[in-house]
């Protein structure tokens, strides 16, 4: 199975756009790592930088890819690929969506 996880306020706590001070949610990182270890594919998708670049994924990538990758690696998150460029939105409607609190609540 393939899973795609958001970063801010899903895998870590982030206040506003203060990404440098994001703190990992260890229980969630551990659970994602267990999915990885069980052979699932793990993608990380974030909207970091999309608001400040007028939803320009190339500029968002240039601005935040290295910081985000360094954070994920320092948190020991196991994943297959990191994607920037998720459009900024207040609500995502998706037939395969799941609220983070619902996904993680019975596990952590």
Regions found by a protein language model. Name each.
Residues 1-108:
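Catalytic phosphate/metal-binding cores of nucleic-acid and nucleotide-processing enzymes, i.e., regions
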């Amino acid at each position: 199975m393939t899973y795609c996880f958001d970063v801010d306020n899903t895998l870590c706590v982030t206040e506003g756009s203060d990404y440098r001070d994001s703190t990992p949610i260890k229980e969630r990182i551990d659970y994602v790592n267990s999915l990885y270890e069980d052979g699932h594919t793990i993608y990380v998708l974030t909207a970091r930088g999309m608001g400040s670049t007028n939803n320009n994924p190339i500029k968002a990538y240039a601005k935040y890819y290295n910081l985000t990758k360094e954070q994920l690696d320092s948190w020991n998150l196991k994943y297959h690929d990191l994607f920037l460029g998720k459009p900024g939105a207040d609500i995502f409607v998706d037939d395969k969506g799941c609220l983070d609190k619902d996904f993680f609540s019975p596990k952590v």
